[in-house]
Amino acid sequence: MNVTLVEINIKPERVDEFLDVFRANHEGAIQEPGNLRFDVLQDPRVKTRFFIYEAYKDEEAVMAHKKTPHYLACVDKLEALMSEPRKKRCFVGLMPE
């Protein structure tokens, strides 16, 4: 299992727009055959900080996700909404199998 944790910091005045843009990516991602989980989380202390927890069955599924129209549209719109570049960490999921 391939897991990615992405931190996204959004300009305060663009949070609602971010949620609209990212909702389309989320809804598309959870329909992908290789997707196991795709959670959008908001930091309760910093309302402009979001974390995306993505789990895919393998690297092939991750690469397929990055070619989907919903992902490409999201990335295209995201740049203008962010207050700083995204931070990404990749993991190998061990449990559950």
Swiss-Prot record:
This protein's UniProt keywords = Cytoplasm, Isomerase
Name the enzyme's class: isomerase
Q: Name its cellular compartments.
A: Cytoplasm
GO CC list: cytosol
The secretion signal range is: none
Q: Which SUPFAM superfamilies match?
A: Dimeric alpha+beta barrel (SSF54909)
Question: Which residue range or ranges hold the ABM domain?
Answer: 2-91
Where is it mostly found? cytoplasm
What InterPro entries does its record include? ABM_dom, AI-2_Isomerase_LsrG, Dimeric_a/b-barrel, LsrG
Q: Per its UniProt entry, which superkingdom is the organism in?
A: Bacteria
The record ties this protein, via Gene3D superfamilies, to: 3.30.70.100
Q: Which reaction does it catalyse?
A: (2S)-2-hydroxy-3,4-dioxopentyl phosphate = 3-hydroxy-2,4-dioxopentyl phosphate
The family database entries (Pfam families) matched by this protein are listed as: ABM (PF03992)
State a single Gene Ontology molecular function: oxidoreductase activity
Quote the EC number. 5.3.1.32
Q: How does it assemble?
A: Homodimer.
Chain's role? Involved in the degradation of phospho-AI-2, thereby terminating induction of the lsr operon and closing the AI-2 signaling cycle. Catalyzes the conversion of (4S)-4-hydroxy-5-phosphonooxypentane-2,3-dione (P-DPD) to 3-hydroxy-5-phosphonooxypentane-2,4-dione (P-HPD).
What family does the database annotate? Belongs to the LsrG family.
- Stated name of the protein: (4S)-4-hydroxy-5-phosphonooxypentane-2,3-dione isomerase
- Name the species this protein comes from: Enterobacter sp. (strain 638)
Give the gene that encodes this protein: lsrG
